Amino acid sequence: MYRNRIKRLLDILLSACGILCLSWLLLLLAVAIKLDSPGPVFFRQKRVGIGKRHFQILKFRTMRIDTPHDMPTHLLHDPEQYITRMGRFLRKTSLDELPQLWNILVGDMAVIGPRPALWNQYDLLAERDKYGANDVRPGLTGWAQIHGRDELEIAEKAKLDGWYVEHISFGLDVKCFF
């Protein structure tokens, strides 16, 4: 019951409340991004959602517009050269993730779940298939993120995502959230 209906209802409530309560901050950050560097306020990127369905993830733009597009930041040669001043602040505080509240509201994502893989991260997607981790909505944060984020090897990240999927519960989501 929790996994299907209650979790989705909580996602809708939390994301709607988040958008409403933080609208002033979202607007302030959007203006700051525009003043800091040329280009759009938002960064959109093709990601993989539930059942390997593609969707466009929404984030505040933290990098220059000439940055290679479909590559994780940690794989770029000298990624610091691409990050804007405002981007450094947004990444350090994780405020660049706030626009994903929209992705949660419309059902592309959940508040808690495996982080959505890039469409071209075939190795991660294949590894997650072993554990059923592609069969749930991806999350803003998740079990693997609180255990190491990008520092984890793909096999370990997929295993942690699979453990989460196997043990989804309100209590586990609360533990991941806080």
What are these regions (language model features)?
Residues 1-66, 103, 170, 175-178:
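A hydrophobic, helix-centered structural microdomain
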Residues 3, 67-85, 89, 115-122:
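Cytosolic-biased juxtamembrane loops and peripheral soluble domains of multi-pass membrane proteins
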Residues 7, 84-87, 159, 175:
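Generic alpha-helical structural signal
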Residues 18, 88-91:
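Surface-exposed charged/polar residues within alpha-helices that form helix-capping/stabilizing sites
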Residues 40, 99-178:
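Hydrophobic structural segments characteristic of membrane proteins
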Residues 43-82, 140-160:
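Short, glycine-rich, amphipathic interfacial segments at transmembrane boundaries or analogous
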